[in-house]
Swiss-Prot record:
Belongs to the DNA mismatch repair MutL/HexB family. Keywords: DNA damage, DNA repair. One of its GO terms (cellular component) is mismatch repair complex. NCBIfam families: mutl (TIGR00585), PRK00095.1-3 (NF000950). Pfam families: DNA_mis_repair (PF01119), HATPase_c_3 (PF13589), MutL_C (PF08676). One of its GO terms (molecular function) is ATP hydrolysis activity. SMART domains: DNA_mis_repair (SM01340), MutL_C (SM00853). It comes from the Bacteria. GO terms for biological process: mismatch repair. This is DNA mismatch repair protein MutL. Gene3D superfamilies: 3.30.230.10, Histidine kinase-like ATPase, C-terminal domain (3.30.565.10), MutL, C-terminal domain, dimerisation subdomain (3.30.1540.20), MutL, C-terminal domain, regulatory subdomain (3.30.1370.100). The keyword DNA repair applies.
Length: 660
């Protein structure tokens, strides 16, 4: 009796499903790719309960004949390749003949299909890979595939499913990538009766980007183009000012197929050069047309890994295309555009009685080492002086008075602000080792910050600055050199750390709400994690397609920081994914303190420099920035005398120093 047996086909398909079908999004990907290969111009994806209950993909493609329909559930049965040579010139998205049998083996599947050559269509129903019904029906040209009760016979796979919102976000991401890869196809995604994605199918990639990432994002995208004898590169890349906290927005397409490739990602970043800050990544959609002989897609059943010949030449082509496109642009932000963002629209003012105003300001008390709110009457126009750097001026500015006619709660386009992403002010030279994705380093950093003890700061007398970066001061212990960025970062960190923890009752209503726009997958993920944002005083409400509205903000957040601050917090939440409130607040304080601090090569006047040293003296730990870098160094009088050889070393002193 032999010990080796040939596995039944259904069991073999279930094993194959372990690689091909990881989650509901995998099913959507395989079915939609089949629809694209069938030359469809319209594809509709409908799901229920994030695909676990039902996934239905309808297309208007070529369809299948009555004879071919049952063969589609046979393993390694395909119409896309017929010989070994075809394997090296693949132009379709599918070719292995594994996807549909694998899906059918772990679900109940219903297929309705018809070709334009016949007067009737066909219906197939299968459960667990076993065909139960095969009959002729009347149905439009094309194919409709319904997958129900996914993983019903593989309960172990269900244990590893994330929340419904997380699985839905994966599906949205898959449809978005395929929409970008095939702008000539009109895609519609409907979840539990609600439309999440819709593209026009005009063939215009820029229009597809607008449908997925929003019009505001598309306006800041540049077209790129480059080619040689082997490759043709085209697409769109974002301006350096428009970035995200991870690589999820970098889409690389090879012959209409979305792929993952580390070296090509690096080529994209190389094209930006020093224009990108550390830890930030651009929004990119790059389409690469390549001779199929130069690309091997038969690497993994998911077909997302592709081996490319002449990869180094392709990298250089991509980098050059991006750098040349950026050179042609004026990367200096438009001052008038920024001014317009900070101003509000004007309306006719109704007659009103002059009333005394109450101004609420947040002030710092150096005696109590704490902040307090003070109200004061304002009789005339409130001065809008905003010193770049004075005493710890974190006053909450009143929204510029905008008298709106009395209206209902409904907010129209004229009474909201569209929030813009923050500009890149954080450079690699500031903190080259800061990586929010490295959870171990972050944990060590936060533990060190929590265990800091109150330090005694020396009394310093400021007398100068060098290269707009270092401050010089003297004290009884000699010469002190202070890194101005690290110093203010420490001051800002302790401020944000304290104030972020006091958000329960410190909210201020906005006269003009802000709108925040996200991609479909990020929008869904943020909805699931909204409670974490609420913990730090950010209350976002759903407002239209992939958009949130902010009606109030925490009092520790300045008016000019609202748009950038909220986006930064959302990016951090999406990046770190699972994070405790305590860690979330600490990470937020670290990041915001760095972004809000003065940078190198910025000259300070004597008043501002002395104020910085006074604030530093009030800190719990004035000697290190939140990332652990030293804030100041000290040269004692003896050190200075040794450097100028006023003190001669002897054998004993050298031996004590371990140098002899």
């Amino acid at each position: 009796m032999t010990n080796i047996i040939e596995l039944p086909e259904v069991l073999a398909n279930q094993i194959a499903a372990g690689e091909v079908v990881e989650r509901p999004a995998s099913v959507v990907k395989e079915l939609v790719e089949n629809a694209i290969d069938a030359k469809s111009s319209q594809i509709t994806v409908e799901i229920e309960e994030s695909g676990l209950k039902m996934i239905q993909v309808t297309d208007n493609g070529e369809g299948m004949s009555h004879e071919d329909l049952p063969l589609s559930l046979r393993r390694h049965a395909t119409s896309k390749i017929k010989s070994q040579s075809d394997l090296f010139r693949i132009r379709t998205l599918g070719f292995r003949g594994e996807a549909l049998p694998s899906v059918a083996s772990i679900s109940k599947i219903t297929i309705k299909t018809a070709t334009k050559e016949v007067t009737h269509g066909s219906l197939l129903i299968a459960t667990g890979g076993e065909i139960e019904t095969l009959e002729a029906i009347s149905t439009p040209t094309g194919t409709k595939i319904k997958v129900e009760n996914l993983f019903y016979n593989t309960p172990a796979r269900l244990k590893y499913m994330k929340s419904l919102q997380a699985e839905l976000a994966h599906i949205v991401d898959v449809v978005n990538r395929l929409s970008l890869a095939h702008p000539e196809v009109a895609f519609t995604l409907i979840s539990d009766g609600r439309q999440l994605t819709q593209t026009s199918g005009t063939g215009d990639l820029r229009q597809a980007i607008a449908g997925i990432y929003g019009l505001n994002t598309t306006k800041k995208m540049l077209a790129i183009s480059n080619a040689d004898l082997d490759f043709e590169v085209s697409g769109y890349v974002s301006l350096p000012e428009l970035t995200r906290a991870n690589r999820n927005y970098m889409t690389i397409l090879v012959n209409g197929r979305y792929i993952k490739n580390f070296l090509l990602n690096r080529a994209i970043l190389d094209g930006y050069g020093s224009k990108l800050m550390v830890g930030r990544f651009p929004i990119v959609v790059i389409d690469i047309q390549i001779d199929p002989y130069l690309a091997d897609v038969n690497v993994h059943p998911t077909k997302q890994e592709v081996r490319i010949s002449k990869e180094r030449e392709l990298m250089a082509l991509i980098s050059t295309a991006i750098s040349e496109s950026l050179k042609e642009q004026d990367l200096i932000p438009d001052a008038l555009e920024n001014l317009a963002k900070s101003s509000t629209r004007h309306f006719s003012k109704p007659e009103q009685t002059q009333l005394p105003l109450q101004s609420r300001g947040l002030y710092y008390d150096p005696q109590k080492n704490d902040f307090f709110v003070k109200e004061s009457a304002v009789s005339e126009k409130i001065p809008e002086t905003d010193f770049y750097f004075g005493t710890v001026d974190n006053s909450v500015k009143v929204e510029k008075a905008e008298l709106l006619p009395h209206s209902e709660e409904v907010i129209g386009p004229s009474s909201v602000k569209h929030a813009s992403r923050p500009q890149n002010t954080f450079t690699e030279t500031d903190h080259p080792n800061l990586d929010l994705k490295n959870r171990q380093k972050l944990s060590q950093m936060l533990t060190r910050l929590e265990n800091e003890e109150q330090s005694v700061f020396p009394e310093l007398d400021y007398f100068g600055q060098m290269h707009g970066t270092y401050l010089f001061a003297q004290g009884k212990d000699g010469l002190f050199i202070i890194d101005q960025h690290a110093a203010q970062e420490r001051v800002k960190y302790e401020y944000y750390r304290d104030k972020i923890g006091e958000v329960d009752s410190s909210l201020q209503q906005l006269l003009v709400p802000y709108l925040f726009e996200f991609s479909g997958s990020d929008f869904i993920n943020l909805q699931e994690k909204m409670a974490l944002l609420n913990e730090v005083g950010i209350f976002l409400e759903v407002y239209g397609h992939n958009t949130f509205i902010l009606r109030e903000h925490p009092i520790w957040m300045k008016e000019e920081e609202i748009a950038s601050g909220v986006y930064e917090m959302c990016d951090m939440l999406l990046l770190t994914n699972e994070v405790s409130i305590k860690t979330y607040r600490a990470e937020l304080a670290i990041m915001m303190s760095c972004k809000r601090s003065i940078k190198a090569n910025h000259s300070l006047d004597d008043y501002s420099a002395r104020n910085l040293l006074l604030q530093l003296a009030q800190c719990q730990n004035p000697y290190n920035c939140p990332h652990g870098r030293p804030v100041l160094i000290n040269f004692s009088k003896a050190d200075m005398e040794k450097m100028f050889r006023r003190i001669q070393e002897n054998h004993t002193s050298l031996r004590e120093l371990g140098k002899y």
